[in-house]
């Protein structure tokens, strides 16, 4: 059986016409970039990059271009259980290293980013999306810095959805580097999915708006205008290399 889960979305990025510290003066917003995905087919290569292969977190899916496409004004990202597994071209017999030790590709999905094409510092980011909520889903809308290894480059998770100990949650997070290599300091809020579905049983069937307001002093993460998490000035000013005062690329 070929199992598919789909995620559809539209992006918009707004920047302040005045000082970034004046985030609440919403009349000063100026749209600097948006993507409405109005042309069916592949994403605009002037803006988006496709990832290829097994990438991170020891996840089961192989990322490939065919699983992300524009249709009817949405970016559609498909996670598939393939009818027929194919060989991992990077497989190395007797290797104990991931992903060289994975012989077959059973699941595929897509991950796209704006690295070196659309990067920004401060402002408002809005993403309208409908996310899959079936078991095994790990949808994400996130931002990373570049030029340093993770987590020293700083990570902002506008949205993550996955199951924690079997219970579905929506998360709004940020992390940054510490004195110990590859060890992150997290500011994370995990909201049980029932917080949303108790108010609207059809929540998962609808599009919703995730928003980030980012200035010199804080990062505020919203879902449908509800504040989920605020990462304050301690993180933005005392984190390694002041990573939240540097440009970020978008990923999904």
Q: Which ranges hold each PLM region?
A:
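Bacterial N-terminal signal peptides that target proteins for export
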Residues: 1-11
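Sec/Tat signal peptide C-region and signal peptidase I cleavage site
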Residues: 21-25
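GH16 jelly-roll
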Residues: 26-252
């Amino acid at each position: 059986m070929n199992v598919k889960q789909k995620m559809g979305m539209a992006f918009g990025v707004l920047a302040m016409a005045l000082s970034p510290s004046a985030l609440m003066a919403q009349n000063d917003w100026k749209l600097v970039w948006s993507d409405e995905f109005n042309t069916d087919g592949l994403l605009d290569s002037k803006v988006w990059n496709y990832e290829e292969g097994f990438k991170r977190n020891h996840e089961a899916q192989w990322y490939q271009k065919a699983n992300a496409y524009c249709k009817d004004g949405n970016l559609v990202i498909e996670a598939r259980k393939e009818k027929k597994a194919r060989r991992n071209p990077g497989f190395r017999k007797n290797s104990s290293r991931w992903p060289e030790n994975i012989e077959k590709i059973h699941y595929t999905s897509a991950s796209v980013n704006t690295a070196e094409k659309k990067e920004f510092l401060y402002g408002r980011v809005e993403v309208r999306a409908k996310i899959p909520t079936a078991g095994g889903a790990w949808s994400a809308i996130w931002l990373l810095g570049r030029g340093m290894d993770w987590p020293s480059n700083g990570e902002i998770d506008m949205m993550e959805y996955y199951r924690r100990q079997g219970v579905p949650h929506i998360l709004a997070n940020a992390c940054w580097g510490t004195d110990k290599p590859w060890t992150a300091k997290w500011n994370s809020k995990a909201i049980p999915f029932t917080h949303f579905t108790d108010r609207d049983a059809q929540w998962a069937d609808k599009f919703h708006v995730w928003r980030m307001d980012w200035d010199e002093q804080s990062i505020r993460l919203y879902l449908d205008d509800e504040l989920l998490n605020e990462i304050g000035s301690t993180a933005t000013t005392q984190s390694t290399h002041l990573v939240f005062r540097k440009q970020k690329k978008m990923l999904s």
